């Protein structure tokens, strides 16, 4: 019951704390193209994460599950949205269902609603090879997310305090998994060094989960008697983290998440190097406050607006969007300069 209570508290505080931190996309500006030689009707948005083909670069990221009927109902509605728009969808951490079998349905509902969709299983980096297999089998997943959440765990009153051996555990899962493994952050971003470490052990896809979206340090601090407020502003902003990851020149697929709310955010993330973008808190707030039909409408508008932006930039598809020129300025430019990353590549291509 304690785990179920925590899952429900996470939803409550995620909704109440909002997205108050900047993701850095305000520092990214496209170079206007007066002669784009493009047509809205010819713009397509298909993309790939590794070997997985997606009809959209937008997908529903891991949010919940394991909190009884309420989380089952949330996942059910999100699955209907995913099915309606042919979006990939990730479930929240399934460790709750591995510990408490009565919670299995709160995750399995996603596959029941969307039997032919692309669904991602999800576990923390403490997971074993056997637990990873069980999580994938539970929802007949097409891929497995392994989330890295050191700051959240440290801030969580009942969280983990020992993070030794994480890279080796992930490597073991990668070597034995029958589905692709996506390693993701949860709002604190990934550095180029972390990305390189993951590439070295055979990880083929990452979700940088940058600073700017749901603040899990703030969420966990709401549950503490003594706040660890120094973690509330911890992390690498989403825009900077995408560029850090891209600078490693690896072949791994890059997913951008962390405060993404608009089609312009999506376009900028892809132009910086992402193959796909993931929405969590923004979609959850619409679902909880305005309902499933409104969320379905919002996703439709996101796709329309993304195609408008791509038309303006002369990009007929996602690969062409990844090559349009843009300028990096402000705090993001200064961060990347200090990190030894040359942003001229983006403005001169």
Swiss-Prot record:
This enzyme's EC code(s): 5.3.3.2
Main location, first listed in the record: cytoplasm
One Pfam family linked to the record: FMN_dh
GO molecular function: FMN binding; isopentenyl-diphosphate delta-isomerase activity; magnesium ion binding; NADPH binding; oxidoreductase activity
InterPro entries attached to this UniProt entry: Aldolase_TIM, FMN-dep_DH, IPdP_isomerase
Origin: domain of life: Bacteria
GO annotation terms (biological process): isoprenoid biosynthetic process
GO cellular component: cytoplasm
Places the protein is found: Cytoplasm
Reactions catalysed according to its record: isopentenyl diphosphate = dimethylallyl diphosphate
Cofactor(s) listed: FMN; NADPH; Mg(2+)
Ligand binding (substrate): 6-7, 152
Keywords carried by this UniProt record: Cytoplasm, Flavoprotein, FMN, Isomerase, Isoprene biosynthesis, Magnesium, Metal-binding, NADP
Positions bound to FMN: 62-64, 93, 122, 184, 214, 258-259, 280-281
Binding site for Mg(2+): 153
Record function comment: Involved in the biosynthesis of isoprenoids. Catalyzes the 1,3-allylic rearrangement of the homoallylic substrate isopentenyl (IPP) to its allylic isomer, dimethylallyl diphosphate (DMAPP).
Record-stated family: Belongs to the IPP isomerase type 2 family.
Subunit structure: Homooctamer. Dimer of tetramers.
The protein's name in its UniProt record: Isopentenyl-diphosphate delta-isomerase
Source organism per UniProt: Bacillus cytotoxicus (strain DSM 22905 / CIP 110041 / 391-98 / NVH 391-98)
